[in-house]
Amino acid sequence: MKLNFSGLRALVTGAGKGIGRDTVKALHASGAKVVAVTRTNSDLVSLAKECPGIEPVCVDLGDWDATEKALGGIGPVDLLVNNAALVIMQPFLEVTKEAFDRSFSVNLRSVFQVSQMVARDMINRGVPGSIVNVSSMVAHVTFPNLITYSSTKGAMTMLTKAMAMELGPHKIRVNSVNPTVVLTDMGKKVSADPEFARKLKERHPLRKFAEVEDVVNSILFLLSDRSASTSGGGILVDAGYLAS
């Protein structure tokens, strides 16, 4: 997808690997100035070599105070991609307080915090903007051992709608992308059992999982003016799974 983001500044969380990393690369190639946020410094070092000129920020978004310190003075942002997330696989009866708190602090609370910072600045500057929350199809369907992750993504669905309603009058659009399994490092955890992965893939009408590029293209579309009247919804990148 050929889009031009020249003159715009984007912030991408979870930028070190997978979907976030490729989103940074695509935005950089499309002319945007990009702030890349992740907690692993080595990922930022290698990403900066691939994308000269990006602004790397190393912070654990699960730490509220550290995030405030790292991003509180980040400056104007026109495009935000909330991609940071983690998966802790446990059945319901074995979910620990630590796993629950960690999952919600990274997968959901950080979306609140970073979005508040960015949206307040957009409003103060009187400029439109676009926010994309990277969710999952498990916001809508259940999978074994993903109850905590699914709960964070289900909550993100309502957060996206509420943000769109409240920020819409300020010309700030908010949407989500909801992919099926994407074979990133995180996605491979879900599909580690070959037999489970085979059966799961067969339940997708297109008989495939999503490629990282598929998700990135949907993110870019929602960030761009080509989706100027789209807000409060989500794009399913699920190879038809929910339709089945």
UniProtKB/Swiss-Prot annotation:
SUPFAM superfamilies: NAD(P)-binding Rossmann-fold domains. Keywords: Mitochondrion, NAD, NADP, Oxidoreductase, Phosphoprotein. InterPro entries: L-xylulose/Carbonyl_redctase (IPR051737), NAD(P)-bd_dom_sf (IPR036291), Sc_DH/Rdtase_CS (IPR020904), SDR_fam (IPR002347). GO terms for cellular component: mitochondrial matrix; mitochondrion. Predominantly expressed in lung, in ciliated cells, non-ciliated bronchiolar cells and type-II alveolar pneumocytes. Also detected in adipose tissue (at protein level). Low expression in testis, heart, kidney, spleen, brain and liver. CDD domains: XR_like_SDR_c. The active site is at Y149. Substrate binds at S136. GO terms for biological process: small molecule metabolic process. Signal peptide: none annotated. Induction: By glucocorticoids. Activated by fatty acids. It catalyses: a secondary alcohol + NADP(+) = a ketone + NADPH + H(+). The modification Phosphoserine is found at S42, S176. NADP(+) binds at residues 11-39. PANTHER family: CARBONYL REDUCTASE [NADPH] 2, D-ERYTHRULOSE REDUCTASE. Uses both NADP and NAD as substrates. Has a strong preference for NADP. Homotetramer. Belongs to the short-chain dehydrogenases/reductases (SDR) family. May function in the pulmonary metabolism of endogenous carbonyl compounds, such as aliphatic aldehydes and ketones derived from lipid peroxidation, 3-ketosteroids and fatty aldehydes, as well as in xenobiotic metabolism. This is Carbonyl reductase [NADPH] 2. It comes from Mus musculus. The lineage of its organism: Eukaryota, Metazoa, Chordata, Craniata, Vertebrata. The gene is Cbr2.
